């Protein structure tokens, strides 16, 4: 059933949910189901599940956990701390139900079978400082999006305001508009509509300023963590603290991804053939981790503006008939390879239990 069957005697598939987890112990050689169980998703349940694994899979065992970064994160951290071997599996494709049959334990069996059929299995992402950076990135991203939404709302309020207000604020740059609206005042002689509009503009502008301050504070904290964890990324041309943080969070730790090609595929930067006849083309990859893809795109745009070597490359490829989109795709693939090799050589190791030996990293790293 694949390479995993050669390294383990049992696979314990786990279907994770918010309040409970279902598990199934499956023989790696035959795929036979030895036992199933369901536990609460808490510390007591994790201990029960570990005892279940030791009882029904006493020899070499591996835990194949769905959603190890969300509903299964607590269980994954617990098992790794206990020295267990854990792999991450995507949600398996659900087959057509027979007579309406469906249960969490059946899903756990499918997760185990899915892991046995795959040639490559991912390790769970590291926690610790990487997880700290990840949650700060998510929070900052939420603040930025909320700020953008509030700015759009502010401009819409200006458009519909009465002429005496609209005349004061129209054609004003965004930063100045926010500042002026945050300091608007009313007089008792103003109409009810005027006072209400000013109140709405003032509160919206102050919300924008608060969100901007929040995003700046979070960026400072992210930068401090990046400097402490992967400072080498900041030495690369065109990489700021936010891009470096996203690249590190997506990569996670040494050995998690088997090659620079896998990292590029994760970031949606791997070429997808779209050739026909005498025309050799590659199209954009719109799958993968879009936040990582955004970071790679930002790095490429910065280098196109400030790096003479990148600009010379773009000019040469343009002369060869490549479109700007194709050139950026090529550059993103190069950046992905460069950063992967840098992190594999100098990045942090995972603080997890030992696993069976992996083959060497495949790619163009030297």
Question: Which sequence ranges carry the predicted segments?
Answer:
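A detector of single, family-specific signature residues
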Residues: 1-366
């Amino acid at each position: 059933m694949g390479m995993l069957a050669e390294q383990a005697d049992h696979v314990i598939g786990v279907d994770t949910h918010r309040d409970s987890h279902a598990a199934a112990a499956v023989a790696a050689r035959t795929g036979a189901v030895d036992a199933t169980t369901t536990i609460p998703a808490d510390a007591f349940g994790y201990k029960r599940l570990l005892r279940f694994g030791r009882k029904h899979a006493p020899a070499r065992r591996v835990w194949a956990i769905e959603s190890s970064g969300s509903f299964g994160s607590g269980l994954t951290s617990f098992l790794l701390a206990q020295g267990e071997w854990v792999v991450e599996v995507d949600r398996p494709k659900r087959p057509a139900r027979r007579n309406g049959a469906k249960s969490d334990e059946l899903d756990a069996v499918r997760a185990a079978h899915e892991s046995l059929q795959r040639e490559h299995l991912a390790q769970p992402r590291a926690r610790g400082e990487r997880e700290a950076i990840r949650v700060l990135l998510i929070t900052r991203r939420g603040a930025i999006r909320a700020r953008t939404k509030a700015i759009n709302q502010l401009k819409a309020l200006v458009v519909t305001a009465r002429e005496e207000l609209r005349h004061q604020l129209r054609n004003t740059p965004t930063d100045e508009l926010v500042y002026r609206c945050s300091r608007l005042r009313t007089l008792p002689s103003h109409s009810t509509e005027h006072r209400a509009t000013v109140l709405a503009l003032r509160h919206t502008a102050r919300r924008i300023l608060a969100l901007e301050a929040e995003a700046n504070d979070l960026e400072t904290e992210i930068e401090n963590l990046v400097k402490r964890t992967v400072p080498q990324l900041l030495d690369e041309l065109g990489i700021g603290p936010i891009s470096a943080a996203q690249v590190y969070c997506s990569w996670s730790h040494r050995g998690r991804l088997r090659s620079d090609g896998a990292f590029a595929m994760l970031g949606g930067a791997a070429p997808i053939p779209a050739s026909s006849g005498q025309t050799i083309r590659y199209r954009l990859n719109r799958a993968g981790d879009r936040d990582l893809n955004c970071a790679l795109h930002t790095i490429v745009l910065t280098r196109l503006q400030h790096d003479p070597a990148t600009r010379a490359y773009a000019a040469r490829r343009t002369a060869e008939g490549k479109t700007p989109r194709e050139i950026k795709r090529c550059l993103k693939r190069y950046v992905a390879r460069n950063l992967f090799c840098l992190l594999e050589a100098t990045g942090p190791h995972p603080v997890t239990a030992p696993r069976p030996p992996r083959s060497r990293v495949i790619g163009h790293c030297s």
